[in-house]
Protein backbone atom coordinates (compact mmCIF):
# COMPACT_ATOMS: atom_id res chain seq x y z
CA UNK A 1 0.00 0.00 0.00
CA UNK A 2 1.22 3.51 -0.78
CA UNK A 3 1.11 5.65 2.34
CA UNK A 4 2.65 8.84 0.91
CA UNK A 5 0.15 11.70 0.92
CA UNK A 6 0.15 15.47 0.84
CA UNK A 7 -0.36 16.83 4.36
CA UNK A 8 -1.64 20.20 3.11
CA UNK A 9 -5.24 19.03 2.95
CA UNK A 10 -8.51 20.86 2.67
CA UNK A 11 -8.51 21.99 6.33
CA UNK A 12 -6.47 25.05 5.32
CA UNK A 13 -8.61 26.32 2.43
CA UNK A 14 -9.88 29.37 4.27
CA UNK A 15 -7.98 30.25 7.44
CA UNK A 16 -10.45 32.74 8.83
CA UNK A 17 -13.35 30.34 8.35
CA UNK A 18 -11.24 27.61 9.93
CA UNK A 19 -10.76 29.51 13.18
CA UNK A 20 -14.48 30.29 13.36
CA UNK A 21 -15.24 26.61 12.89
CA UNK A 22 -12.67 25.66 15.54
CA UNK A 23 -14.25 28.05 18.01
CA UNK A 24 -17.70 26.63 17.39
CA UNK A 25 -16.43 23.07 17.60
CA UNK A 26 -14.78 23.54 20.99
CA UNK A 27 -17.87 25.20 22.42
CA UNK A 28 -20.00 22.31 21.15
CA UNK A 29 -17.62 19.77 22.63
CA UNK A 30 -17.71 21.43 26.03
CA UNK A 31 -21.49 21.60 26.00
CA UNK A 32 -21.77 17.95 25.02
CA UNK A 33 -19.25 16.96 27.69
CA UNK A 34 -21.29 18.67 30.36
CA UNK A 35 -24.40 16.79 29.24
CA UNK A 36 -22.89 13.31 29.35
CA UNK A 37 -24.30 10.90 31.93
CA UNK A 38 -22.41 9.00 34.61
CA UNK A 39 -19.99 11.83 35.22
CA UNK A 40 -18.90 13.19 38.58
CA UNK A 41 -17.43 16.38 37.16
CA UNK A 42 -18.39 18.98 34.58
CA UNK A 43 -16.62 21.53 32.41
CA UNK A 44 -17.69 25.15 32.67
CA UNK A 45 -16.11 27.54 30.16
CA UNK A 46 -15.13 31.08 31.06
CA UNK A 47 -14.02 33.70 28.53
CA UNK A 48 -11.13 32.57 26.35
CA UNK A 49 -9.29 35.87 26.97
CA UNK A 50 -8.36 34.67 30.44
CA UNK A 51 -7.33 31.33 28.92
CA UNK A 52 -9.08 29.49 31.73
CA UNK A 53 -11.96 27.06 31.91
CA UNK A 54 -12.91 25.97 35.38
CA UNK A 55 -13.90 22.50 36.52
CA UNK A 56 -16.67 22.61 39.07
CA UNK A 57 -16.65 19.83 41.70
CA UNK A 58 -19.80 18.00 42.56
CA UNK A 59 -21.12 18.02 46.08
CA UNK A 60 -19.49 14.66 46.79
CA UNK A 61 -15.90 15.16 45.65
CA UNK A 62 -13.38 17.43 43.95
CA UNK A 63 -12.85 16.99 40.22
CA UNK A 64 -10.00 14.75 39.10
CA UNK A 65 -6.83 16.24 37.69
CA UNK A 66 -5.45 15.37 34.28
CA UNK A 67 -2.99 13.03 35.97
CA UNK A 68 -5.76 11.22 37.85
CA UNK A 69 -7.68 10.71 34.63
CA UNK A 70 -4.53 9.48 32.88
CA UNK A 71 -3.80 7.04 35.71
CA UNK A 72 -7.34 5.71 35.42
CA UNK A 73 -6.92 5.26 31.66
CA UNK A 74 -3.42 3.75 32.10
CA UNK A 75 -2.10 6.44 29.78
CA UNK A 76 1.13 8.39 30.19
CA UNK A 77 0.65 12.16 30.15
CA UNK A 78 4.07 13.69 30.52
CA UNK A 79 6.18 16.77 30.01
CA UNK A 80 9.79 17.76 29.42
CA UNK A 81 11.48 19.27 32.45
CA UNK A 82 14.79 20.41 33.88
CA UNK A 83 16.21 20.38 37.43
CA UNK A 84 16.30 24.19 37.42
CA UNK A 85 12.52 24.29 37.10
CA UNK A 86 12.05 21.94 40.05
CA UNK A 87 13.14 24.64 42.50
CA UNK A 88 9.96 26.63 41.76
CA UNK A 89 7.14 25.50 44.10
CA UNK A 90 4.48 26.85 41.75
CA UNK A 91 5.95 24.76 38.95
CA UNK A 92 6.23 21.58 41.00
CA UNK A 93 2.70 21.89 42.39
CA UNK A 94 1.34 21.95 38.85
CA UNK A 95 3.70 19.23 37.64
CA UNK A 96 2.82 16.84 40.47
CA UNK A 97 -0.92 17.35 40.09
CA UNK A 98 -1.24 17.11 36.34
CA UNK A 99 1.40 14.74 34.92
CA UNK A 100 2.40 11.13 35.51
CA UNK A 101 5.35 11.14 33.11
CA UNK A 102 8.63 13.06 32.89
CA UNK A 103 11.43 13.43 30.36
CA UNK A 104 14.62 15.43 30.61
CA UNK A 105 14.62 18.37 28.22
CA UNK A 106 18.41 18.38 27.94
CA UNK A 107 20.01 16.71 30.97
CA UNK A 108 20.45 13.28 29.37
CA UNK A 109 21.92 14.51 26.11
CA UNK A 110 25.53 13.53 25.54
CA UNK A 111 26.97 17.04 25.59
CA UNK A 112 25.48 17.66 29.04
CA UNK A 113 26.60 14.34 30.53
CA UNK A 114 30.19 14.05 29.37
CA UNK A 115 32.30 17.10 28.56
CA UNK A 116 35.45 14.95 28.73
CA UNK A 117 35.90 11.46 27.35
CA UNK A 118 35.28 8.81 29.96
CA UNK A 119 34.11 11.32 32.57
CA UNK A 120 30.40 11.62 33.31
CA UNK A 121 28.45 14.03 35.46
CA UNK A 122 25.04 12.56 36.21
CA UNK A 123 24.19 14.99 39.00
CA UNK A 124 21.49 16.90 37.13
CA UNK A 125 20.03 13.81 35.50
CA UNK A 126 19.93 12.17 38.93
CA UNK A 127 17.95 15.11 40.32
CA UNK A 128 15.31 14.54 37.67
CA UNK A 129 15.27 10.79 38.22
CA UNK A 130 15.02 11.12 41.99
CA UNK A 131 12.20 13.63 41.68
CA UNK A 132 10.28 11.30 39.38
CA UNK A 133 10.74 8.40 41.80
CA UNK A 134 9.50 10.43 44.77
CA UNK A 135 6.42 11.51 42.86
CA UNK A 136 5.74 8.18 41.17
CA UNK A 137 6.26 9.46 37.65
CA UNK A 138 7.38 7.30 34.74
CA UNK A 139 10.50 8.55 32.95
CA UNK A 140 11.35 8.53 29.25
CA UNK A 141 15.06 8.74 28.50
CA UNK A 142 16.05 11.31 25.87
CA UNK A 143 18.30 10.75 23.96
CA UNK A 144 21.17 8.32 23.41
CA UNK A 145 22.21 8.86 19.79
CA UNK A 146 21.78 12.21 18.04
CA UNK A 147 24.04 14.27 15.85
CA UNK A 148 23.40 17.47 17.82
CA UNK A 149 24.44 18.52 21.34
CA UNK A 150 27.49 16.28 21.21
CA UNK A 151 30.60 17.13 23.28
CA UNK A 152 33.45 18.94 21.54
CA UNK A 153 35.94 16.23 22.43
CA UNK A 154 33.91 13.87 20.25
CA UNK A 155 33.02 16.05 17.28
CA UNK A 156 36.53 17.50 17.01
CA UNK A 157 38.25 14.10 17.08
CA UNK A 158 39.46 12.29 13.97
CA UNK A 159 39.11 8.60 14.73
CA UNK A 160 38.67 5.30 12.94
CA UNK A 161 35.30 3.64 12.44
CA UNK A 162 36.12 1.03 15.09
CA UNK A 163 37.11 3.72 17.57
CA UNK A 164 33.82 5.54 17.04
CA UNK A 165 31.97 2.26 17.59
CA UNK A 166 33.78 1.72 20.88
CA UNK A 167 32.92 5.24 22.04
CA UNK A 168 29.25 4.92 21.09
CA UNK A 169 28.92 1.53 22.76
CA UNK A 170 30.60 2.80 25.93
CA UNK A 171 28.25 5.77 26.08
CA UNK A 172 25.08 3.77 25.57
CA UNK A 173 26.15 1.08 28.01
CA UNK A 174 27.12 3.63 30.67
CA UNK A 175 23.99 5.77 30.48
CA UNK A 176 21.40 3.05 30.00
CA UNK A 177 23.10 0.86 32.57
CA UNK A 178 23.05 3.59 35.20
CA UNK A 179 19.27 3.91 34.98
CA UNK A 180 18.42 0.30 34.18
CA UNK A 181 15.03 -0.62 35.59
CA UNK A 182 14.16 3.04 36.24
CA UNK A 183 13.44 4.35 32.75
CA UNK A 184 10.42 2.92 30.96
CA UNK A 185 11.45 3.97 27.44
CA UNK A 186 14.51 5.35 25.68
CA UNK A 187 14.69 7.47 22.55
CA UNK A 188 17.63 5.45 21.34
CA UNK A 189 18.15 7.20 18.00
CA UNK A 190 16.86 10.71 17.43
CA UNK A 191 16.05 12.24 14.03
CA UNK A 192 18.00 9.94 11.69
CA UNK A 193 16.00 10.78 8.53
CA UNK A 194 15.78 13.70 6.13
CA UNK A 195 12.55 15.18 4.74
CA UNK A 196 12.49 12.63 1.91
CA UNK A 197 12.73 9.70 4.31
CA UNK A 198 16.38 8.86 3.61
CA UNK A 199 19.08 8.41 6.23
CA UNK A 200 20.76 11.74 6.89
CA UNK A 201 24.50 11.95 6.28
CA UNK A 202 24.94 13.00 9.90
CA UNK A 203 27.87 12.67 12.27
CA UNK A 204 27.16 9.04 13.16
CA UNK A 205 26.41 7.98 9.59
CA UNK A 206 29.78 9.35 8.50
CA UNK A 207 31.64 7.95 11.51
CA UNK A 208 30.23 4.41 11.51
CA UNK A 209 27.88 3.98 8.56
CA UNK A 210 24.12 3.27 8.42
CA UNK A 211 24.47 0.34 10.79
CA UNK A 212 24.98 2.77 13.69
CA UNK A 213 21.21 2.65 14.21
CA UNK A 214 21.02 -1.13 14.52
CA UNK A 215 24.07 -1.25 16.77
CA UNK A 216 22.67 1.43 19.07
CA UNK A 217 19.46 -0.52 19.66
CA UNK A 218 21.36 -3.74 20.28
CA UNK A 219 23.67 -2.10 22.82
CA UNK A 220 20.79 -0.33 24.58
CA UNK A 221 18.87 -3.58 24.88
CA UNK A 222 21.90 -5.36 26.31
CA UNK A 223 22.28 -2.63 28.94
CA UNK A 224 18.61 -2.77 30.01
CA UNK A 225 16.55 -5.63 28.55
CA UNK A 226 13.37 -4.32 30.22
CA UNK A 227 13.39 -0.82 28.72
CA UNK A 228 11.26 -0.05 25.68
CA UNK A 229 13.42 1.23 22.84
CA UNK A 230 12.16 3.91 20.44
CA UNK A 231 13.19 5.56 17.22
CA UNK A 232 12.23 9.23 17.66
CA UNK A 233 11.54 11.37 14.60
CA UNK A 234 10.21 14.81 13.69
CA UNK A 235 7.60 15.75 11.07
CA UNK A 236 6.68 12.11 10.50
CA UNK A 237 3.36 11.91 12.34
CA UNK A 238 1.17 12.06 9.23
CA UNK A 239 1.51 10.36 5.87
CA UNK A 240 4.38 11.75 3.87
CA UNK A 241 7.77 10.78 2.50
CA UNK A 242 9.42 11.03 5.89
CA UNK A 243 6.90 8.82 7.69
CA UNK A 244 7.17 6.35 4.83
CA UNK A 245 10.92 6.35 5.45
CA UNK A 246 10.35 5.69 9.16
CA UNK A 247 8.02 2.83 8.31
CA UNK A 248 10.54 1.30 5.92
CA UNK A 249 13.39 1.71 8.41
CA UNK A 250 11.63 0.12 11.37
CA UNK A 251 10.20 -2.65 9.19
CA UNK A 252 13.72 -3.52 8.09
CA UNK A 253 14.96 -3.42 11.66
CA UNK A 254 12.27 -5.85 12.76
CA UNK A 255 13.08 -8.19 9.88
CA UNK A 256 16.69 -8.25 11.09
CA UNK A 257 15.66 -9.02 14.66
CA UNK A 258 16.71 -5.64 16.04
CA UNK A 259 15.15 -4.98 19.48
CA UNK A 260 12.94 -1.98 18.70
CA UNK A 261 9.64 -1.50 20.51
CA UNK A 262 8.19 1.72 19.20
CA UNK A 263 8.28 4.96 17.27
CA UNK A 264 8.29 8.38 18.87
CA UNK A 265 6.35 11.06 17.01
CA UNK A 266 7.81 14.37 18.15
CA UNK A 267 5.12 16.76 16.88
CA UNK A 268 6.68 20.20 17.08
CA UNK A 269 3.78 21.73 15.19
CA UNK A 270 2.64 25.02 13.69
CA UNK A 271 -0.96 26.08 14.08
CA UNK A 272 -1.25 27.09 10.43
CA UNK A 273 -0.30 23.58 9.27
CA UNK A 274 -1.62 20.96 11.70
CA UNK A 275 -1.45 17.26 10.88
CA UNK A 276 -4.58 15.60 9.54
CA UNK A 277 -5.94 13.38 12.35
CA UNK A 278 -7.00 10.64 9.94
CA UNK A 279 -3.47 10.48 8.55
CA UNK A 280 -1.97 10.27 12.02
CA UNK A 281 -4.41 7.48 12.89
CA UNK A 282 -3.51 5.56 9.74
CA UNK A 283 0.18 5.97 10.46
CA UNK A 284 -0.27 4.70 14.02
CA UNK A 285 -2.29 1.76 12.76
CA UNK A 286 0.32 0.55 10.29
CA UNK A 287 2.92 0.69 13.06
CA UNK A 288 0.55 -1.29 15.29
CA UNK A 289 0.36 -3.93 12.58
CA UNK A 290 4.14 -4.27 12.90
CA UNK A 291 3.73 -4.78 16.65
CA UNK A 292 5.22 -1.37 17.49
CA UNK A 293 4.07 1.12 20.10
CA UNK A 294 3.72 4.85 19.48
CA UNK A 295 4.54 7.67 21.88
CA UNK A 296 3.81 11.32 21.19
CA UNK A 297 7.07 12.61 22.58
CA UNK A 298 7.61 16.38 22.18
CA UNK A 299 4.29 18.04 21.41
CA UNK A 300 3.93 21.79 21.20
CA UNK A 301 1.90 23.98 18.82
CA UNK A 302 3.30 27.36 17.76
CA UNK A 303 0.89 30.26 17.33
CA UNK A 304 3.17 33.07 16.26
CA UNK A 305 2.89 32.80 12.46
CA UNK A 306 -0.78 31.82 12.21
CA UNK A 307 -3.33 34.45 11.12
CA UNK A 308 -6.23 35.57 13.28
CA UNK A 309 -6.79 36.97 16.74
CA UNK A 310 -5.02 35.62 19.80
CA UNK A 311 -8.32 34.35 21.20
CA UNK A 312 -9.13 32.53 18.00
CA UNK A 313 -5.66 31.03 17.81
CA UNK A 314 -5.85 29.75 21.38
CA UNK A 315 -9.12 28.01 20.58
CA UNK A 316 -7.73 26.59 17.35
CA UNK A 317 -4.65 25.39 19.20
CA UNK A 318 -6.94 23.55 21.59
CA UNK A 319 -8.56 21.73 18.69
CA UNK A 320 -5.15 20.57 17.44
CA UNK A 321 -4.27 19.23 20.89
CA UNK A 322 -7.67 17.58 21.17
CA UNK A 323 -7.47 15.94 17.75
CA UNK A 324 -4.12 14.42 18.65
CA UNK A 325 -5.21 13.32 22.13
CA UNK A 326 -8.33 11.63 20.77
CA UNK A 327 -6.34 10.01 17.97
CA UNK A 328 -3.78 8.64 20.42
CA UNK A 329 -6.44 7.43 22.86
CA UNK A 330 -8.28 5.65 20.05
CA UNK A 331 -5.14 3.88 18.81
CA UNK A 332 -4.40 0.53 20.40
CA UNK A 333 -0.66 1.16 20.43
CA UNK A 334 -0.42 4.86 21.42
CA UNK A 335 0.47 4.79 25.10
CA UNK A 336 2.05 8.17 25.87
CA UNK A 337 1.30 11.84 25.25
CA UNK A 338 4.22 14.14 26.17
CA UNK A 339 4.40 17.90 25.70
CA UNK A 340 7.76 19.64 25.34
CA UNK A 341 7.35 21.78 28.42
CA UNK A 342 4.85 22.48 31.17
CA UNK A 343 4.03 26.18 30.80
CA UNK A 344 4.63 28.75 28.08
CA UNK A 345 7.05 30.45 30.47
CA UNK A 346 9.49 27.54 30.13
CA UNK A 347 9.05 26.78 26.42
CA UNK A 348 12.18 26.43 24.29
CA UNK A 349 10.55 28.08 21.27
CA UNK A 350 10.95 31.80 22.10
CA UNK A 351 14.62 31.23 22.79
CA UNK A 352 15.03 29.63 19.38
CA UNK A 353 12.88 32.00 17.29
CA UNK A 354 13.24 35.24 19.24
CA UNK A 355 9.47 35.62 19.22
CA UNK A 356 6.97 35.27 22.01
CA UNK A 357 4.78 32.22 21.67
CA UNK A 358 2.26 30.17 23.62
CA UNK A 359 2.79 26.56 22.49
CA UNK A 360 1.89 24.54 25.61
CA UNK A 361 -1.03 23.52 27.83
CA UNK A 362 -0.50 26.12 30.56
CA UNK A 363 -0.08 29.88 30.19
CA UNK A 364 2.77 31.91 31.65
CA UNK A 365 0.50 32.76 34.60
CA UNK A 366 0.19 29.01 35.33
CA UNK A 367 -3.46 28.91 34.28
CA UNK A 368 -4.77 26.11 32.04
CA UNK A 369 -5.41 27.14 28.45
CA UNK A 370 -8.09 25.85 26.06
CA UNK A 371 -5.50 23.28 24.93
CA UNK A 372 -5.40 21.81 28.44
CA UNK A 373 -9.17 21.50 28.64
CA UNK A 374 -9.30 20.00 25.18
CA UNK A 375 -6.93 17.20 26.23
CA UNK A 376 -8.85 16.86 29.50
CA UNK A 377 -12.15 16.44 27.62
CA UNK A 378 -10.64 13.87 25.26
CA UNK A 379 -9.32 11.81 28.16
CA UNK A 380 -12.54 12.15 30.12
CA UNK A 381 -14.58 11.00 27.12
CA UNK A 382 -12.33 7.98 26.60
CA UNK A 383 -12.95 6.94 30.20
CA UNK A 384 -16.70 7.44 29.90
CA UNK A 385 -16.81 5.50 26.63
CA UNK A 386 -15.15 2.53 28.32
CA UNK A 387 -17.73 2.38 31.10
CA UNK A 388 -20.31 -0.41 30.79
Question: Where in the sequence are the language-model features?
Answer:
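Substrate-binding cleft and catalytic face of glycoside hydrolase catalytic domains
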Residues: 97, 101-115, 124-236, 303
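Acidic-and-aromatic substrate-binding clefts and catalytic sites of carbohydrate-active enzymes
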Residues: 79-92, 110-123, 193-198, 236-245, ...
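Boundary/entry segment of secreted carbohydrate-active catalytic domains
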Residues: 57-101, 105
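Short, acidic/polar
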Residues: 83-98, 166-175, 241-253, 320-325
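Bacterial N-terminal signal peptides
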Residues: 21-33
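Substrate-binding cleft of secreted/luminal carbohydrate-active enzymes
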Residues: 315-352, 363
Amino acid sequence: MQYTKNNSKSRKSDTNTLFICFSSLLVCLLVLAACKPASNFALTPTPIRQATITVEPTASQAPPTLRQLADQQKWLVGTASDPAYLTNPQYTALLDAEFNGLVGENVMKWGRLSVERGIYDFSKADVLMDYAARHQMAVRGHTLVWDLQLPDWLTQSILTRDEYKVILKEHITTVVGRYAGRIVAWDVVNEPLDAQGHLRQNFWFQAIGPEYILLAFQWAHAADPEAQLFLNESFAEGLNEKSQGVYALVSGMLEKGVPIHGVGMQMHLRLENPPVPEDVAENMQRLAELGLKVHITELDVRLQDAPGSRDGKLVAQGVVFEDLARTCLAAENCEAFFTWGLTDHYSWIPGMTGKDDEPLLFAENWQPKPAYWAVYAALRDAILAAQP
